[in-house]
């Protein structure tokens, strides 16, 4: 399994709301992520500036690149757009992170 990480940006004043929305994540979104080959997905928040650090594993042959085409993914992005930095299509702005250290 490949592990990837990326950074997103939350409005720092919306930390509690971001966590609440993820505590109530839609079952159909969870299913779409798993069906795309994603597992062990965690998001960490830096409360000082709203930086989000996400890390996940994806299986070989994953379908992660097809997620933006799924209606549930687009609905989730719209639901989160009021509290995050987003692209014109409401997807969160995300910057890939390069691993610089790993302790197996």
Curated annotation (Swiss-Prot):
Biological processes per GO annotation: rhamnose catabolic process
Keyword Cytoplasm: yes
Gene3D superfamilies: 3.30.70.100
EC code: 5.1.3.32
Enzyme class: isomerase
Family annotation (Pfam families): rhaM
Keywords: Carbohydrate metabolism, Cytoplasm, Isomerase, Rhamnose metabolism
Annotated catalysed reactions: alpha-L-rhamnose = beta-L-rhamnose
This protein's GO CC annotations: cytoplasm
Entry GO MF terms: L-rhamnose mutarotase activity
Biological or metabolic pathway of the protein: Carbohydrate metabolism; L-rhamnose metabolism
Residues the record marks as active site: 22
Localization per record: Cytoplasm
Domain of life: Bacteria
Binding-site positions, substrate: 18, 41, 76-77
Subunit-structure text: Homodimer.
Function: Involved in the anomeric conversion of L-rhamnose.
NCBIfam families: YiiL_rotase
Family: Belongs to the rhamnose mutarotase family.
Identification of the protein by name: L-rhamnose mutarotase
Organism for this UniProt entry: Acidiphilium cryptum (strain JF-5)
Source organism phylogeny: Bacteria, Pseudomonadati, Pseudomonadota, Alphaproteobacteria, Acetobacterales
């Amino acid at each position: 399994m490949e592990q990837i990480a990326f950074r997103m940006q939350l409005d720092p004043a919306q930390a509690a709301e971001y966590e609440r929305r993820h505590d109530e994540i839609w079952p159909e979104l969870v299913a779409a992520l798993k069906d795309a080959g994603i597992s062990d997905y965690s998001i960490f928040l830096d409360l000082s500036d709203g930086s989000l650090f996400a890390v996940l594993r994806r299986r070989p042959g994953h379908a992660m690149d097809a997620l933006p085409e799924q209606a549930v993914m687009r609905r989730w992005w719209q639901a989160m757009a009021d509290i995050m930095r987003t692209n014109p299509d409401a997807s969160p702005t995300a910057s890939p992170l390069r691993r610089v250290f790993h302790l197996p």
